[in-house]
Each structure stands twice: as C-alpha cells, then as structure tokens.
UniProtKB/Swiss-Prot annotation:
GO molecular function annotation: ATP binding; CTP synthase activity; glutaminase activity; identical protein binding; metal ion binding
UniProt feature coiled coil, ranges: none
Further remarks about this protein from its record: CTPSs have evolved a hybrid strategy for distinguishing between UTP and CTP. The overlapping regions of the product feedback inhibitory and substrate sites recognize a common feature in both compounds, the triphosphate moiety. To differentiate isosteric substrate and product pyrimidine rings, an additional pocket far from the expected kinase/ligase catalytic site, specifically recognizes the cytosine and ribose portions of the product inhibitor.
Protein name: CTP synthase
Organism for this UniProt entry: Geotalea daltonii (strain DSM 22248 / JCM 15807 / FRC-32)
Length: 534
C-alpha cells in the first residue's frame, strides 16, 4: 500500500490538544490493522529541545536512538506501538542547519538559496524519509495557524497534495469552539476565522476536530461545515474528557477514523477497541480504590515537565486496578521549611530527575524520610543519585558525600562525571542519551518486576555512580541490582530491608504505555497499594 499522509494543524489557541488528537487517531487506525508512524514538526529555531528550560518547553522525551524530542512524541508512543526515532521530530533550526550545510558543500550549484523551494523541499524530504515502511504517516505541525514561524512548514505540506496526489493526503485541523458563559452559548466564529486563515495559505482542511466544553448540536455542526467548506460528517466534536485515554473512544464514536479511511480510500478491518475500553473501565471504576503518590521535584509548578512520569504512574494504577492520586511537592520548599506534615499521608514517594543544585537537599531529606519510615520509594535519574548520596551520608557515615556536579571539591563524590563526558563543553546533544542494556541481579526488586535478567532502558545524564565508593556502600547494605556491564556502570540501586526502595539511573517512564504498563511502575504502585493496606 502506498503511504498516506495526514497533516494535523491547530488554530485559535496553543495547547489545544493537537498531539492528543494525532495520537488518538494513530491508535484508532492501528486498531484497524494499519501500520502507523508519527512525526512532529516544531517551528522554533533551536536544533532540539534538549537545552530548553522545562518551564518553557515542558518535558524532553528521549527516543531509543538518543533523540531529545518534543513531549508529543511521548503521546504518540504511548497510544500506538510505534517506536519513534531522530527522524520523528525536527525543528526550523534543524532544517536551516541542513540547508546551509548543503549550500556550503556546493549542492545547489551556485543558485540562490531560498525558502521556496530549498527550505520547503528539505521539509518534504524529512517527512518522506520518516514515513518509509508505514501505511499511514501522521504529521503534526507545531504552533498555531497564523504564526509567522509556521509558514514554511504549512507551505511545504500544501505542496504535498500536488506532489503525492489528492488521494494520498488529508488535512486535519484542530480548532476551538469556546463556550461563552455570559451568553450561555458556544461560538463558532474563532473556528471560521482559523479555517479562513488556513485556506488563505492554500490548505483546505478535510476534517475539523472541534475542541469544546460541551457537545456540539447538529445545527452548529452544519453551520461550521457551511462556513468552513467541509462535509457536516467531517465536523468532529472533541468534548473535554474525564481522562485522556478516553479520547480515542470518544473520537471513534464521532466517526473520526471512519472519515479518515473513507477520504483516503483505504479498506481496513473493523477496529478492535476492546483493549482501550478495558483501560478506560479500570480508570473510571477501579476495584482497589486509590493510592496517594508524592512527586518531590523542582519543576512542580509546571507539571508538563513530568508528563511521561505522571502517565507512567497512571499506567501502574491501571495494572493494579487502582486510581493514582498525585501530589506535587517542591523540593526547594522542603529544603527551606522542612518536611513536617507534608508526607505523612502518602502511600509512596517518587523523586524524579532534574538538573542543577537547587532543591537537591530537599530531595535528600525526602529520601531519608521514605527510607526510615519504610514508605515505598522510587528514584529516577537524579532521584537515584540523591538516594545514593543520602545512603552514603546517613548509613555509611560519609557526612560530606555529594555529587561532584554540585560540589566539585567534596571529599566523597559518590556521584561523579562520566569519563567520556570529561572535556565535553558543548551542551546540546552531548549527554549519555538513548537506550542501553542493563543486567539485573536475580531476586532483586527490579528483577522480580521485569521477570528477566536482561533489559534495555533509555538514558539522559552526564553523571554516574562512582565505583570508588562501591565497597563501602555495598558493605553497609546498598544493593547494586542493575549494571551496564560494558562500562561497569551502576544503573539500579536498592535497599532490601524495606518494603520497596529502588533507584534507577535511566528513565523507565519513556517506555510505559496504558496498554503495556512499565514493570517498575507496576511494581511501585503495587508496593504503595500494599503499604496503604498495611
């Protein structure tokens, strides 16, 4: 089958849910037996989001091949079976970088390099390259129609219909139909203007997904269809859902996937949505009540910084048939004001990754609380490193133990810079990134969770466990239960005389899915549930 291309644009406001719409459509088409891939095109000039503040960009999602990408790729991987790569996300910065390199090599034979055709051709070539081997390629354009930064991308996808044939290209526009409380009615004018602007660029949307607080009445769908030049059945309501994993089912009820396969002239089997129905049922009606998990981090004022993490915890709840209630606590506040009263009622504590010294002592206090009070604990990346620091200080008696990242001259740097990172001065794309193998210790918490001895997980770090302190930590009871054998790098630490205490250097949240929860999150929530019952 010749690859079909679906381009997803957004209008009226940012953060309208294009990523979730694209991911949900991918899930629906995959349930029909189609091979789906995803791609996100970001209009900013940064080469990638790896050096951007979490407060500006939210989470950086890491792929198996080490790409630092937009958090929407996390949605795509969670909703489908796709394993995305460096080709799945590119930016204006990458496009211009590539074109300028070609110009310097003389690839354009002395011609004047312009946005059209050179930039648009580069964009199209990257889209085509990523789509190879798939039946459907769903490409989301970042930003909002009308943004000046998006224009080269929109021009490139406009040309796609002429290049690939109208039967192989579909334009899907996600827009807002706001409810005005004072008038007590939904308003279609923002959608009309958004589509008008898109049509002025030369793109006529085939399907509209209308985000709204309440159901769109039929007469309003007819009005939108008339003024936006689409079929009435192609006006899809996307009402605010109680949970994001209910969105694929809601869009299916609206006929989204049926419209897509009809307009692209694809024959498919009937969709099998039973797995999604089971997920939603467990979310809405859990058998075991709820568990309370505290996430103690430094980016808690923007929870999008922990998007994959919060979703992975939800997946752990699905696996244990319970609801997970998350409480976000600022580690810097704990550092300044103490821990009293903040963690008394939680069933489990998670300390996530991060960069910089701010809030680290608050994380260490939190870890000590979890260790001494026997509360199930999960430390990820920096959370694992601070667990090692806490153990070294309070159990091994190494009072000045710390990470050389924060105190280069400390006498006991139990965490230190990786050998291959020494001398690296450039920030972008230079960390230990992507998937690496890890060998587990038989009988450990981690091995019991995975059910195997050999695993592969994704990383994003420069600092590691310092093997010079290995003996003293092990002699005092710290279990090094996961090791990257090639570099003798400690990946997982545990405490055995504890209900569940695990720290890992990698980011397991990047591989968790609602239909296939990650083993460590499944085990962590199970321990928290057991702690609640106790």
């Amino acid at each position: 089958m010749k690859t079909k291309f679906i381009f997803v644009t957004g209008g009226v406001v940012s953060s309208i849910g294009k990523g979730l719409a694209a991911a949900s459509l991918g899930a629906l088409l995959e349930s029909r037996g189609l091979r789906v891939t995803h791609q996100k095109l970001d209009p900013y000039i940064n080469v990638d989001p790896g050096t951007m503040s979490p407060f500006q960009h939210g989470e950086v999602f890491v792929t198996d091949d080490g790409a630092e990408t937009d958090l929407d790729l996390g949605h795509y991987e969670r909703y489908t079976s796709a394993r995305l790569s460096k080709k799945s996300n590119f930016t204006t910065g990458q496009v211009y970088f590539s074109v300028i390199e070609k110009e310097r090599r003389g690839d354009y034979l002395g011609g004047t390099v312009q946005v059209i055709p050179h930039i648009t051709d580069e964009i199209k070539s990257k889209i085509i390259e990523n789509a190879k081997g798939s039946d459907i390629a769903i490409i989301e354009i970042g930003g909002t129609v009308g943004d000046i930064e998006s224009l080269p991308f929109l021009e490139a996808i406009r040309q796609f219909k002429a290049d690939r044939g109208a039967a192989n290209v579909l334009y899907l526009h996600v827009t807002l139909v706001p409810f005005i409380k004072t008038a007590d009615e939904l308003k279609t004018k923002p959608t009309q203007h958004s589509v008008k602007e898109l049509r002025e660029i030369g793109i006529q949307p085939d399907i509209l997904i209308c985000r709204c607080e309440q159901d769109l009445p039929r007469d309003m769908k007819a009005k939108i269809a008339l003024f936006c030049n689409v079929e009435e059945k192609a006006v899809i309501t996307s009402q605010d859902a109680e949970h994001i994993y209910a969105v694929p089912l809601a869009l299916h009820r609206e006929g989204l996937d049926e419209q897509v396969v009809e307009k692209l002239n694809i024959w498919t089997k009937a969709p099998d949505l039973a797995p999604w129905q089971q997920v939603v049922e467990k979310l809405m009606n859990p058998s075991h009540g709820k568990v309370r998990i505290a996430i103690v981090g430094k980016y808690v004022n923007l929870t999008e910084s922990y998007k994959s993490l919060s979703e992975a915890l939800t997946h752990g709840g699905i696996a244990n048939d319970c609801r997970v209630h998350l409480t976000y606590l600022d580690s810097e506040k704990i550092e300044q004001e103490g821990i009293d009263g903040l963690l008394e009622d939680v069933d489990g504590i998670l300390v996530p990754g991060g960069f910089g010294e701010r809030g680290t002592e608050g994380k260490i206090k939190t870890i000590e609380f979890a260790r001494t009070r026997k509360i199930p604990f999960f430390g990820i990346c920096l959370g694992m490193q601070m667990a090692v620091v806490e153990y070294a200080r309070n159990v091994c008696g190494l009072e000045d133990a710390f990470s050389s990242e924060f105190k280069p001259d400390c006498l006991n740097p139990v965490i230190h810079l990786m050998e291959e990172q020494k001398g690296v001065s450039r920030k972008g794309g230079t960390m230990r990134l992507g998937a690496y193998p890890c060998t587990l210790t038989k009988g450990s918490f981690a091995q019991k969770a995975y059910g195997t001895l050999d695993i592969s997980e994704r990383h994003r770090h420069r600092y590691e466990f310092n093997n010079k302190n290995r003996t003293v930590l092990v002699e005092n009871g710290l279990v090094l239960s996961g090791v990257y054998k090639e570099g003798d790098l400690v990946e997982i630490v545990e405490i055995t005389d504890h209900p569940w205490f695990v720290g890992c250097q990698f980011h397991p949240e990047f591989k968790s899915k609602p239909l296939n929860p990650h083993p460590l999150f499944k085990a962590f929530i199970a321990a928290a549930l057991q702690n609640k019952k106790a």
